[in-house]
Amino acid sequence: MAGVSFSGHRLELLAAYEEVIREESAADWALYTYEDGSDDLKLAASGEGGLQELSGHFENQKVMYGFCSVKDSQAALPKYVLINWVGEDVPDARKCACASHVAKVAEFFQGVDVIVNASSVEDIDAGAIGQRLSNGLARLSSPVLHRLRLREDENAEPVGTTYQKTDAAVEMKRINREQFWEQAKKEEELRKEEERKKALDERLRFEQERMEQERQEQEERERRYREREQQIEEHRRKQQTLEAEEAKRRLKEQSIFGDHRDEEEETHMKKSESEVEEAAAIIAQRPDNPREFFKQQERVASASAGSCDVPSPFNHRPGSHLDSHRRMAPTPIPTRSPSDSSTASTPVAEQIERALDEVTSSQPPPLPPPPPPAQETQEPSPILDSEETRAAAPQAWAGPMEEPPQAQAPPRGPGSPAEDLMFMESAEQAVLAAPVEPATADATEIHDAADTIETDTATADTTVANNVPPAATSLIDLWPGNGEGASTLQGEPRAPTPPSGTEVTLAEVPLLDEVAPEPLLPAGEGCATLLNFDELPEPPATFCDPEEVEGESLAAPQTPTLPSALEELEQEQEPEPHLLTNGETTQKEGTQASEGYFSQSQEEEFAQSEELCAKAPPPVFYNKPPEIDITCWDADPVPEEEEGFEGGD
């Protein structure tokens, strides 16, 4: 905000002011206003009529300043009044801007006694202004008025004196009084100075005491801190000592346990080595390798499907020849106990298996017997077929086996799948295993076995069934190297049911009395032998022992063993290794338990054998396999019962 300016019309302003304050001049008032549109102050008018004339020159649209001289009858000198006129029609913004100019205007016009603010003529009252001047509210000092008074004093007349004679006593009292007060004043100053020094000393002493106390407190805190640190350090050392002792004790215990563990491991290793050596020694004492038995049986089973069957009187029923090929019963395989399976999965069992492999690879295979004559191979007898079936069935036992509940043969009617499978297997094995030198005594025994088979099955004709004796004979007695009561049948035969019609004539049935019959067992003893499942003896460890077969030729019929049939099959076609090989060859699919007794490779060989023989129907296998495990057969130790059994043979 810009202030009032006196530079533009300064001379005019001062000239009018001098005219008013000079006593010789007749003018007693002057009126000032702003120049249009600016803050420059200028002279508007002046006159000699006093307040009455000045009040008539104020305008309502402007801001104006009136300087007037008022004479009082009681005062010797005139009084000066400054009137601040703000018209009623002046804008508010202009009023605010000019409000700060009043002080500067009063300073410019020196000697102003009273400042009167007015916005109308009624506000300018000569009586009110005179009252304010007489009450002493106006200023009494002014540079102009001071000069005027000095001028009046110079013109004044001299006055009389007021001197009086000096009194010594009074003067001494005055002097003494003054000295006393001066001395008192000095003493007071000294006292104050001493008090100030004492206060300063007290403050210094207090500060020193405070600092000393703080130092002592700091030392006490440091002492307590050091004591605490010492306690902590001592506790830490004790803790470390305890931890070191605990670590030593633990290390000592670990060393003791480690030595004990090492001793146990060494003892276990020695025991394992002794078990391996013992197993190797036991395996080395075996005359034959059980693995070769499974190979031979597998090859016989694979080749039997491809061979062409010769018509026999017992297989001329409609559908019997087809069912015999479709329903082939799997050869029973011995199962393993849980203890054997758990042993095979241990490192000791693995070492035993490796030792078995080494011993097996070092043993030469048994020599096969001479091949059978061509006549009997081409035209096998049904009696020999049934005998081969009964003789091959016990050879499937290779160790102690726990027979499951479902192993018992269910009741079968005429033409059941199990009976057809029995005839099919007998016929095919008879083709492969025809006897080399038929004997009269052996033929008698074979004749009885054929009669027993015809009695157990219902697939033969009624006329043939009538010619067979009803007594049941223990077929296990025909097993070579087995002795009396060595084994019993696994299934219970049922009485045959005659078929509805006679489809096989007597002319097709061979004469059964061409050889001398063997004396039959008593009826009670035969039934007890067939039906007693609780007294089954354990078969020997090996079944393919040529020496045992030769040694017991009088008690059993001399039939060609499996190696002879195997030799014939190898001359015709070399089959692929199948799932029944005991760990020497890798299983093709690894799903023997889910796909059935025969693996996929055997099914392929059966498919190839069908091309060789157009008369043979496609084989049908069962999907439910026997619950056995033959993967680690050689790793199983020979039980004591088997050793005693072999010793008895």
UniProtKB/Swiss-Prot annotation:
GO MF: actin binding; cadherin binding; profilin binding; protein sequestering activity
Tissues in which the UniProt entry reports expression: Expressed in the brain, with expression in the molecular layer of the dentate gyrus, stratum pyramidale, and stratum radiatum of the hippocampus (at protein level). Also expressed in the terminal varicosities distributed along dendritic trees of pyramidal cells in CA4 and CA3 of the hippocampus (at protein level). Expressed in pyramidal cells in CA2, CA1 and the subiculum of the hippocampus (at protein level). Expressed in peripheral blood lymphocytes, including T-cells (at protein level). Expressed in the brain.
Keyword Cytoplasm: yes
InterPro entries membership: ADF-H, ADF-H/Gelsolin-like_dom_sf
ADF-H domain mapped to chain residues: 3-134
Pfam families per record: Cofilin_ADF
Region (Disordered): 208-420, 477-502, 538-620
Biased composition (Pro residues): 363-374
Cell inner membrane is among the record's keywords: no
Residues modified to N-acetylalanine: 2
One GO biological process term: cell communication by chemical coupling
Primary localization class, coarse: cytoplasm
Keywords: Acetylation, Actin-binding, Alzheimer disease, Amyloidosis, Cell junction, Cell projection, Cytoplasm, Developmental protein, Differentiation, Neurodegeneration, Neurogenesis, Phosphoprotein
Locations listed in the record: Cytoplasm; Cell projection, Dendrite; Cytoplasm, Cell cortex; Cell junction
Phosphothreonine PTM sites in chain numbering: 331, 335, 346, 497
Functional note: Actin cytoskeleton-organizing protein that plays a role in the formation of cell projections. Required for actin polymerization at immunological synapses (IS) and for the recruitment of the chemokine receptor CXCR4 to IS. Plays a role in dendritic spine morphogenesis and organization, including the localization of the dopamine receptor DRD1 to the dendritic spines. Involved in memory-related synaptic plasticity in the hippocampus.
UniProt disease link: Alzheimer disease: Alzheimer disease is a neurodegenerative disorder characterized by progressive dementia, loss of cognitive abilities, and deposition of fibrillar amyloid proteins as intraneuronal neurofibrillary tangles, extracellular amyloid plaques and vascular amyloid deposits. The major constituents of these plaques are neurotoxic amyloid-beta protein 40 and amyloid-beta protein 42, that are produced by the proteolysis of the transmembrane APP protein. The cytotoxic C-terminal fragments (CTFs) and the caspase-cleaved products, such as C31, are also implicated in neuronal death.
Protein name as annotated: Drebrin
Organism: Homo sapiens (Human)
